[in-house]
Amino acid sequence: MQSDDIIWDVINKNFCSFKTTFNKTKFCKNEYNVTGVCNKVSCPLANSRYATVREEEGVCYLYMKTVERAHTPNRLWEKIKLDPNFMKAIEQIDSHLEFWPGHMSHRVKQRYIRITQYLIRMRKMRKQIKRELVPIKKKAERRDATRENKALIAAHLTTNIKKELLERLNKGTYADMHYFPEDIINNVLEKEGEADQFSEEEADENEEEGEEEMEEEFEDDIDDIEDAGGAFEYVEGDDDEDDIDDEYENEPYQDDDEEDDDDDDDDDEEVKPQITKKRGPTFKPTKKTPQKRVHMEVEIEEETENQAN
């Protein structure tokens, strides 16, 4: 015959494998404990009549222990599946614990409420989107990058080969060596020619637009200068040459005979040729200086060779 008082005295005063203490409070680790507190009322070992609720894979079960099954440990706990509906499960607990103590049925209901609450939270968390950390393989990334580069190079090669073959067909290097019908080749060549003409027309249009813009800018600059009261003055090169010739005519000319009279001792020596270099003078405009002017400088070098007779 089981004696609850003797069992509790042994467990309370001596060792119990399920008993733990935290902050001077005793707790029970037994899976059938209703409250989790280590005391005589909540201890599943020291009570011959006991009931609790357990959750297994999201399903709640009601466990009951009676004195009649104390001699069969494998059949000690009666297992009853509770309905997933909360109200129906409460009715099941009330019906099975109708003649049990009130505090026992109340604690079982409290435990069932806590279990249903954390099951609801678990369902909500499963529905939420979670971030997964995926490991990145550097070797695989490098391999993919090299493959992409090779594919790009191959694509460029194919386009260049295509252009080269079309150019050779246009030039007629293959003549009648190809195995394709002439209609297809002519169509391809016509399409390529149209594309080239279109590109050439676009280039010509761009050049014409650029020339027109340059002319417009030049005309705008001229208009601005005329508005400011200035004028262009160009200096021609022919007039400069005439002026330089006049200067040389006005300068006195020394003859080789006069030099021989001055130097009496050097009669037998030959007179070396003299090379005269003169830089042409720069002419400044007489009119008022405009804002923009064109300056031209002319340099003329003349060599005169005079030999003594």
Curated annotation (Swiss-Prot):
Keyword Protease in annotation: no
Region of interest: Disordered: 194-309
Gene Ontology, cellular component aspect: nucleolus; preribosome, large subunit precursor
Nucleus listed as a keyword: yes
Entry-linked InterPro entries: Mak16, Ribosomal_eL28/Mak16
UniProt superkingdom: Eukaryota
Subcellular location: Nucleus, Nucleolus
Residue ranges, compositional bias (Basic residues): 275-293
Encoding gene, per UniProt annotation: mak16l
GO BP annotations, alphabetical order: maturation of 5.8S rRNA; maturation of LSU-rRNA; ribosomal large subunit biogenesis
Coiled-coil intervals, chain numbering: none
Acidic residues bias: start-end ranges: 195-227, 235-270, 299-309
Lineage: Eukaryota, Amoebozoa, Evosea, Eumycetozoa, Dictyostelia
Keywords recorded for this protein, A-Z: Nucleus
Similarity comment: Belongs to the MAK16 family.
Gene3D superfamilies in the record: 3.30.390.110
Protein name: Protein MAK16 homolog
